[in-house]
Curated annotation (Swiss-Prot):
Keywords: ATP-binding, Ligase, Mitochondrion, Nucleotide-binding, Protein biosynthesis. This is Glutamyl-tRNA(Gln) amidotransferase subunit C, mitochondrial. The lineage of its organism: Eukaryota, Metazoa, Ecdysozoa, Arthropoda, Hexapoda. Its EC number is 6.3.5.-. GO terms for biological process: glutaminyl-tRNAGln biosynthesis via transamidation; mitochondrial translation; regulation of translational fidelity. GO terms for cellular component: glutamyl-tRNA(Gln) amidotransferase complex; mitochondrion. InterPro entries: Asp/Glu-ADT_sf_sub_c, GatC. Allows the formation of correctly charged Gln-tRNA(Gln) through the transamidation of misacylated Glu-tRNA(Gln) in the mitochondria. The reaction takes place in the presence of glutamine and ATP through an activated gamma-phospho-Glu-tRNA(Gln). Pfam families: GatC (PF02686). Transmembrane segments: none annotated. It catalyses: L-glutamyl-tRNA(Gln) + L-glutamine + ATP + H2O = L-glutaminyl-tRNA(Gln) + L-glutamate + ADP + phosphate + H(+).
């Protein structure tokens, strides 16, 4: 773990818990390292003219995987516009773009040691849930309301 963090100079493990927290200097945030200062001109293909066809099997698969009801025209239109947007950004050239781990790469961020400070509060945490089953939260599946 330490070897991984040593490559990322912006991560530093706090060795003392009583160190005074340093505030970020927002004046230094005006020149991020990897974010370009000027927009990059790029030609995007016009995908709005082509009509996107989605067959019934694909819609049923998406409904099952995402637990979202796509029966309404509004939901189907949102899905189609999302596909058109994905088509546009798929053509962006990212060959020489280095990965951006955080926008604060020039700031050293303090990390605390990975130690349990409080624990054994399962009952207290589960009291926050409306519905539980044994020791688990029960959440509604997607946009379908949970019946009480």
């Amino acid at each position: 773990m330490l070897r991984l963090l040593s490559k990322r100079f912006y991560c530093k493990i706090a060795t003392k818990s009583n160190e005074k927290a340093t505030k970020l200097d927002f004046k230094q945030l005006t020149h991020p390292t990897k974010v370009p200062q000027t927009p990059v001109d790029a030609e995007f293909p016009d995908t709005s003219a082509s009509e996107i066809q989605i067959d019934t099997k694909t819609i049923q698969l998406l409904e099952r995987l995402s637990l979202v009801d796509l029966d309404s025209e509004r939901a189907l239109a949102t899905l189609k516009s999302s596909i058109q947007f994905a088509d546009k950004i798929a053509h962006i050239n990212t060959d020489h773009v280095r990965p951006l781990y955080t926008v604060l790469e020039h700031q050293q961020l303090q990390l605390r040691n990975d130690q349990v400070t409080e624990g054994d509060c399962r009952a207290e945490v589960l009291r926050n849930a409306k519905v539980t089953d044994e020791d688990y939260y029960v959440s509604p599946p997607g946009n379908i309301p949970l019946e009480q």
